Regions:
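Hydrophobic residues on short alpha-helical segments
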Residues: 57-58, 470-478
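Short, cationic-aromatic polyanion-contact patches
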Residues: 466-470, 520-534
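Short acidic, hydrophobic short linear motifs in intrinsically disordered regions
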Residues: 483-493
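A short, conserved structural fragment
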Residues: 510-520
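Short helix-capping/hinge SLiMs at alpha-helix to coil transitions
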Residues: 63, 478-483
Length: 534
């Protein structure tokens, strides 16, 4: 038998239950008190549940989303065996939430939000620029109550009302720089416009398709931040100046951009080979300093944003619906969840930077999350000053560092019988995750001239069947079955078909199964599969 004695350092008196274990070092008592004072939410008289305790209870509520109010409180006080603490009812804890409101939690998040890593930390910068990204998420569900429905509305593909969450993320650490959320019907670019004040001239912002509107590009350009984003397939960009690396200078609205038309061929460990096309626009117009192939490789960092959302929705929340039945409670809970997420990322980055040369993405979010839960239950590490070196969470992170990131690929799936996506295009990506052994990037130069398309389609009702339009087009596609054709290219090739007719007929033939639609405006003779091409 062996006796183990340990000491616990917490706040005195009625404030003892107000802690978050080792995360208290990231969100100290002084910061919480200052935020409460600034937002005028500090208690006027000292009760059994002071306002500071309420803030830590809100954060613990997100740290333990699987249990109710009373069990969350029990976890906060489990390590305080010899300390007299209150024993509130669930109603008392609900009343505590209402007294606080969402304002102090949002103010606390605003203090913690921002870039976390040094510019020299691996994976954080591209040349002199810190890489960040915009992206939205509309899959966070809230309780199906009348008040929530009045605020968020209904959706045809979800049983619960959902929030639209727009974030600006530091891709190297997945830390949050800024967040807005609300009803899903407002649109991603509208929400993203509210975060533009956070961009700085030393930042390079990445985004997916849908953010290339003229007004949004002009607003981003006005911040003097650089950008690299994907263009929609129907966006037409004039060729102003051809560059040596195959890209070209163009203009979108009033913004001067450089357009990169890249084709990426991926070879996987099992021999699977597939090709994808990316059309990017960037404000980095110097092709010698920023080659097109390097920017195309950099664009892959945008997917770090998806990992941030995975940590929020699945690692912390495990896909659960939020607790709150009214809009004010939903806002308060979301800001608490985001604050907790940022605190965990802060410890992860500090732990990675304590070992020079360590990429922050080697630190496991699940390790940090579970270690933080353990520390709360034990009330351990509350007074830890140097949590990166001396803290238990940091030690667990460094002991369980993930291997250096390797390139992998798999298809995107919606594992739900009720999906907002009408169909899944087979683009050749494997159904299971595979390692990538080679990545070949080729930059397509723009054509010398855009051929003029006819204004009228030729009537082919009175020609031989072998000379009719459908036969000729199918024969053209069969010459190179894996080539991706655009309607304009086919119309220009034959010269006797209008673009409108070409779009209409290709769509009908794809519905009939004669050809295959690979993506928006992309057609091929055969479907792309994971089988290596002969």
């Amino acid at each position: 038998m062996m006796a183990i004695t340990r000491s616990v350092t917490v706040a005195a008196g009625k404030f003892a239950s107000g802690h978050l274990g080792e995360l208290t070092a990231v969100i100290p008592f002084e910061l919480v008190d200052a935020v409460l004072h600034e937002t005028r939410r500090l208690q006027r008289r000292l009760r059994d549940l002071p306002s500071r305790v309420g803030i830590y209870f809100l954060l613990a509520m997100c740290l333990f989303p699987e249990v109710g109010y009373r069990l969350v409180w029990d976890k906060l006080t489990a390590g305080l065996a010899n300390v007299p603490v209150a024993s509130p009812t669930p109603k008392a804890l609900r009343d505590l939430r209402r007294r606080l409101g969402a304002t102090p939690v949002r103010a606390l998040f605003d203090v913690l939000a921002g870039p976390l890593a040094r510019p020299t930390t691996p994976g954080v910068s591209f040349g002199p620029y810190r890489t960040v990204s915009f992206d939205g998420c509309s899959s966070q569900k809230v309780p199906d109550t009348e008040r929530n429905r009045a605020w968020l509305g209904r959706t045809s593909h979800h049983g619960y009302p959902t929030l639209e969450l727009m974030t600006l993320v530091e891709t190297g650490t997945r830390a949050l720089l800024g967040v807005v959320f609300g009803p899903t019907d407002e649109g991603e670019t509208s929400y993203a416009s509210r975060l533009l004040h956070l961009l700085r001239p030393h930042m390079l912002v990445l985004w997916d398709k849908g953010f290339d509107g003229n007004a949004f590009l002009a607003a981003v350009s006005a911040t003097r931040a650089q950008f690299l984003g994907r263009l929609r397939s129907n966006r037409r960009t004039p060729v102003l100046t051809r560059l040596a690396d195959g890209s070209y200078l163009s203009v979108i609205g009033t913004v001067r951009v450089r357009v990169i038309d890249a084709q990426i061929t991926v070879t996987c460990a099992d021999g699977t080979c597939f090709t994808g096309s990316y059309r990017l626009a960037t404000s980095l117009t110097d092709s010698r300093r920023y080659p097109a192939a390097s920017l195309t490789r950099l664009y892959h960092q945008r997917w770090e944003h998806e990992s941030a959302y995975y940590a929020l929705r699945h690692t912390i929340m495990a896909g659960r619906v939020l607790r709150s039945g009214d809009p004010n409670g939903v806002k308060q809970e979301m800001w608490a969840l985001l604050t907790l997420y940022q605190a965990l990322r802060t410890i992860m980055v500090d732990a990675a930077e304590s070992v020079p040369g360590t990429d922050p993405d080697r630190c496991g979010f699940t390790i940090a999350f579970q270690a933080a839960r353990d520390q709360v239950v034990q009330a351990a590490g509350v007074g830890t000053a140097n949590y990166a070196a001396d803290g238990r969470i940091g030690q667990k992170l460094l002991a369980g560092l993930l291997p250096a990131r390797r390139q992998r690929v798999s298809t995107r799936k919606v594992k739900s019988p009720m999906s907002r996506y009408s169909e899944r295009h087979d683009d050749g990506r494997p159904d299971v995750t595979l390692a990538v052994i080679s990545l070949d990037i080729s930059i397509h130069e723009p054509p010398e001239t855009q051929p003029a398309l006819p204004t009228r389609s030729r009537d082919d009702r009175y020609v031989l069947p072998t000379r009719r339009r459908r036969h000729r087009i199918l024969a053209l596609l069969q010459e190179n079955p894996t080539r991706l054709w655009r309607p304009r290219e086919i119309a220009a090739h034959f010269g006797d078909i209008t673009l409108h007719t070409m779009y209409r007929q290709l769509s009908r033939w794809a519905d009939d199964g004669l050809i295959h639609k690979i993506g928006p405006g992309l057609y091929a003779a055969t479907a792309w599969t994971s089988t290596p091409l002969a």
